[in-house]
Amino acid sequence: MLDKDRVLSKLDELDSYLSELESVMPKSYEEHVSSIEKKRSCERLLHILIECVIDVCALMVKGLRLGLPSEEEDLFEKLERKKVISKEMKERLKLMRGLRNILVHRYAEVDNELVFESLGNVNDFRKFRKEVSSFLRKLEAA
């Protein structure tokens, strides 16, 4: 059974971290690269936000009994098939997961331009929240 309270709690966490990120986001690329503190804060908050999104996805897949995912990307596929998230959001989540892997595992030296560009996509977190919340409301109405 889907634990809506837990999902909503995670979505509230998402909002909190998003506010934090927006409070430290640089206004320009130059500001981003010139302040190691800002740069690292943004990287870490992006990482936490993406982990939060993945947690919500895992809770939804488990709670809706959509089957065991073979990998994280499978979470997104299952949620799109169930119409929890849109196809566009599924693709955005795949990109987020890729960024998370770069930030965490440092597959390559973290590209300042990639991180700065990702900061311009913070609205994706709001869209994700909106899509999940909308699905939860539909479940309640059913």
What does each model-found stretch correspond to?
Residues 1-142:
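Solvent-exposed interaction patches of small proteins and small membrane subunits
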